[in-house]
Structures are given as C-alpha cells and as structure tokens.
C-alpha cells in the first residue's frame, strides 16, 4: 500500500524497561536514581503514546516523500509502529514506569524491532517539535471527546426540558424568588451554558488545528 499510513490507534495498558538513556554517554558513571526520577516524564506522558506514534508515522511518510529515507525504511517504520501498537493493546508489551519518556520508549523499542531504519525516524525533527505535536494532538483528541460528551448531555437536558413544560417552579434573581417559570425553562438555562462551553471547545480545537506543527 505504499508509505502513506498516517494514523496508529492503540490503547495503553501498563508498562518496557529502557536501560539506556540517550544522553548516557556524557557521564563516566551511573546517574543517581533520584536524578533519573527527576528527569523522567513517563508517568504522565505515557498517555500520549498513541499521538506520539501517529505523529511519527506521518513524519516517516514525509521523509520518504522527500526522498530523505527510502520507501523500504518508511514501510519498516510503519510496520514496526503498528506492531508496537498491537502489542501494547493486547498487553504483550508494557511501558516501564522507569523509562525516561514516551518518545525514547517508542524510538528504542522500534529500533530494537526493525534495526537502523528506526534510528532514521528522528531525522529532521527535534525532540521539542515532537513534544509540541504530541501535546497538541492529545489535547485535540481530549477536546473532541469532551465535545461529544457535552453534546450528549445537552440532548438529555433538552429531552427532559420537553417533558417538563408544565411543571411550574419559582425563578430566582439575586437568590430571591421571582416570577414563576417551568422546570423545563430552568433546564434550558443549563443547556445554554453547556452550548457556550461547547463553542469554546470548538474554538480551541480550531486553534489547535491551525497551529499544529
């Protein structure tokens, strides 16, 4: 099918021991475990592994399209990423909480599986670019999920409001009882609030799409 795959979808289940840090060669002896713990971000960035692998798949396809890596390397990278995704989803592979970060985990696991082609994946991409992309993709995915929940909640509220058009209750202003309203009318006030929240998420997501690296 060529090197065009741009999405890898996985579910995270737990944790692969990464014994080697990328910067280990700078030191003449083992780094204190407290330093490793301070530097490690795997505890919170492992939730971005699906987005990290998705971004890596697209980056590999771009490198192949520009002739920077071969089609064979790209296909190996995509196949390797897919195998990692499958093994994580099935529980055959776990992410070690002692791994430094999710990016190193993916890169080293991929290289162990497909060889030198895995090392070429990082060509033309800084780690900061990768982190920025992962964060934006993750936030965008979370935003879409929250939007779907809000839409469903608004639907439920509207349905309940329609069922309570004759249920009279007091309206309030400045915490004081005011004119009579229906319970359905009161519910629709919350639907309007949630609709504004939905619009804010939509605006934020549009910014993520426009500014995504």
Descriptions of predicted regions:
Residues 18-213:
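A helix-coil-helix interface module used to build multimeric assemblies
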Residues 1-17:
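Short, Lys/Arg-enriched N-terminal segments with co-localized hydrophobic residues
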């Amino acid at each position: 099918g060529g090197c065009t795959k741009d999405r890898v979808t996985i579910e995270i289940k737990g944790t692969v021991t990464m014994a080697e840090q990328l910067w280990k060669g700078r030191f003449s002896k083992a780094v204190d475990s407290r330093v490793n713990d301070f530097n490690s971000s795997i505890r919170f960035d492992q939730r971005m592994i699906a987005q990290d692998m998705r971004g890596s798949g697209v980056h590999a396809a771009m490198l192949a399209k520009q002739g920077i890596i071969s089609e064979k390397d790209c296909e190996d990278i995509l196949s390797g990423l897919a195998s990692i995704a499958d093994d994580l989803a099935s529980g055959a592979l776990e992410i070690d909480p002692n791994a430094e970060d999710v990016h190193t985990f993916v890169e080293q696991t991929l290289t162990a599986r497909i060889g030198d082609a895995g090392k070429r994946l990082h060509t033309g991409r800084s780690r900061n670019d990768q982190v920025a992309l992962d964060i934006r993709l993750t936030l965008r995915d979370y935003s879409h999920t929250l939007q779907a929940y809000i839409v469903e909640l608004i639907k439920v509220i509207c349905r309940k409001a329609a069922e309570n058009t004759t249920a009279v209750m007091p309206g309030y202003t400045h915490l004081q009882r005011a004119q009579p309203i229906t319970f359905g009318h009161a519910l629709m006030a919350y639907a309007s609030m949630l609709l504004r929240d939905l619009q804010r998420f939509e605006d934020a997501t549009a910014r993520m799409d426009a500014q995504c690296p």
